[in-house]
Every structure is written in C-alpha cells, then in structure tokens.
C-alpha cells in the first residue's frame, strides 16, 4: 500500500508568487519519490491481486515467500520479527513482540527465524498466558504475531498439511536438512529448517529438530506443536510446555 503525502512548495518570481504542489510518494521499500503535480497526466491506483505461490508478503521489514500445499497457502519461511531478548528471560505481555535467537545471536534469527513462547506467539489473546488458558477459549483464526490476513495454524490445519504430504516429514524439510532416513526432499515446498528450540531450562537446541507452534491447547494445559526430527521422516505432534521457544509458521486465512 502506498502512503501519499502532499507538500506545498512556493516558488517566488520577480513579479508574482506562484504556488505549485509537489506529491511525495512513500513506497513499500521505504524510499520516497517526489513528483510535481503539474507533470501528472493521469493517476491510477491498482490493487494487485494476491496469488499464493508467486506473491510475497512484506511484514515488519522482512519479505516472506508463499507456497501452495494442497488446499492451503503457507509462508515458506519462519517468522522473524520482534526485539531479541536473552534466552534466560521469559517473554512478557508488554506491547512489544519479543523473540529468542539461538545462542542469543541475531545472525541465527536471520538464518532460522525467531523462537517464541506460546503466549507470545498468540499475543496473549483472551488473556492467554503460558500457565493459564484463554477465556473464552479460542474460536476461529488466531492471528497472533502473523501478518494481517494470516494466522497461527491450528492442530487440524497442521494435520491437513501432514495428510497432504502423506505423512512424509522429509517432504516438509528443506533440501540439505536432516541425515540418514531423515534427509529433506522439500517436495512440498514447505522448506522447514531444523531451527531447534529454546528449552525450559533456558538453553538452546539447534540442527536436530524443527518445532512449530499451533494455536490449539491441550487439556493438560500445554499447547500442541508439530515437529520434525533430524534422522527420520516422521511428522510428530505433542502437547508441549508453553514456555518452550518454537518457530512460528503462518497460514493464510
């Protein structure tokens, strides 16, 4: 979306004052172009349709590509937004999105995306925390930290993804991820990285697992996550402790 700012420029002549208008156009890449209004013959605004698989999403300074897998549209990269905090500190509901980076190194967020506790991922919707359930319980899409028009996948949506790839975790892993019987083929285009996680003891694990939060809680008080393992092709699900720091992958509304 273009944000258009109008400024008035006064040009002084010897015998008269001429007022001319200059239009300043701020583009999505944060560059600005100035155009004299008297040079414009025609001004047309076009809404470019979103096409999953070819369109990209620019969000919080990052550009994400998209992929169609079966009936679903996914971001191909893990989210990487927010302010990095130390792995020794819990993320908090402070109106600022916070993330962990493996080994507290920003370069690892650039490579793998950020890691988020569950409550941070769902943005504390309906009073959700890492120790209490939302009230009322979630119904419908949970945008959380995803861009507008996207949301945190539910358990059911992850299950649909798994069914689409015939329960083959290697089809979800990026090429070059995994070893032995767990080598990624990325035939789905999901491009999962073994980004690891932030553990409940504040330590980090990387290169062995890919963990993704769902928005779905479990009756035990945890939240369901989908995960892939280094050395096998399984697609796994488990109700994890919400204080763990996992990757977040968004799905289109």
Regions found by a protein language model. Give the residues of each.
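Sec-dependent N-terminal signal peptides
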Residues: 4-13
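Surface-exposed, flexible loop/turn segments at secondary-structure boundaries
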Residues: 12, 31, 82
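Structured surface patches comprising rigid loops and adjacent beta-strands/short helices at the edges
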Residues: 36-46
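Conserved positions within compact, well-structured domain cores
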Residues: 48-253
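A periodicity- and composition-biased signal for non-globular, repetitive helical segments
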Residues: 8-9, 26, 179
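Short N-terminal segments immediately surrounding and downstream of signal-peptide cleavage
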Residues: 21-35, 55-61
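Sec/Tat signal peptide C-region and signal peptidase I cleavage site
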Residues: 15-19
């Amino acid at each position: 979306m273009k944000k258009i700012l109008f400024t008035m420029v006064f040009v002084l002549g010897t015998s008269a004052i001429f007022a001319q208008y200059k239009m300043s156009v701020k583009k999505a890449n944060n560059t600005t172009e100035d155009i004299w209004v008297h040079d414009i013959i025609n001004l047309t605004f076009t809404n470019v349709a979103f096409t999953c698989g070819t369109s990209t999403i620019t969000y919080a300074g990052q550009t994400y590509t998209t992929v169609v897998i079966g009936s679903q549209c996914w971001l191909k990269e893990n989210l990487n937004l927010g302010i990095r905090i130390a792995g020794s500190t819990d993320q908090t509901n402070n109106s600022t999105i916070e993330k962990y980076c493996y080994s507290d190194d920003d370069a690892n967020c650039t490579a793998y995306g950020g890691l988020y506790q569950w409550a941070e991922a769902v943005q504390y919707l309906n009073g959700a925390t890492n120790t209490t359930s939302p009230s009322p319980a979630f119904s419908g899409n949970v945008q959380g930290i995803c861009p507008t028009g996207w949301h945190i996948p539910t358990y059911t949506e992850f299950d649909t993804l798994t069914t689409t790839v015939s329960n083959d975790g290697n089809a979800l892993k990026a090429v070059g991820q995994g070893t032995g019987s767990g080598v990624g083929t990325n035939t789905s285009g999901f491009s999962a990285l073994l980004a690891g996680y932030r553990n409940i003891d504040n330590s980090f694990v990387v290169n062995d697992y890919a963990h993704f939060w769902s928005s779905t809680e479990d009756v035990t008080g945890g939240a369901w996550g989908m995960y892939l393992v280094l050395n096998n092709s399984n697609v796994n699900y488990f109700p994890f402790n919400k204080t763990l720091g996992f990757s977040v992958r968004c799905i289109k509304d």
